[in-house]
Amino acid sequence: MPTTWLRRCLPVLPLVLALGCGDSSQPPVPVTGKITYRGLPLQNGTIVFTPDPRKGSSGNMAMGEIKADGTYSLRTGKDFGAAPGHYRITVAAVLGSPPSPGQPYTYQPSLLPEKYRDPELSGLFCEVKGGFAQALDFNLD
């Protein structure tokens, strides 16, 4: 009887394997952009692109430091850019600057509403398409 089970499952096996695997052969593509809050450039912070499993994306997060002019460039680990796919976006920015190495951490108030720190609540989504550099700007209110 095991051969009957195998005959039933064998035609479906490639589909099951394909669903469980992401396309890791696509290299990261450069992603840059600008973050504004209430119409003005956000002057510091971090932006994080988290793969959106509801849209079939998986893999590593990409993140970038927001510079004084509101611009950012993403990195995924040591690589510049982000892998093609769908992402949920979070943005965090605090008043002041982070402590120097060896200095104790002190609480610093957020410059943004807390919803922007949560990928489920931020309302920020995007798709990174493969094959070309992209500029993705986000206007926060």
Q: What do the predicted segments below correspond to?
A:
Residues 1-19:
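Sec-dependent bacterial lipoprotein signal peptides
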Residues 21-141:
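Beta-strand-dominated extracellular/periplasmic modules and repeats
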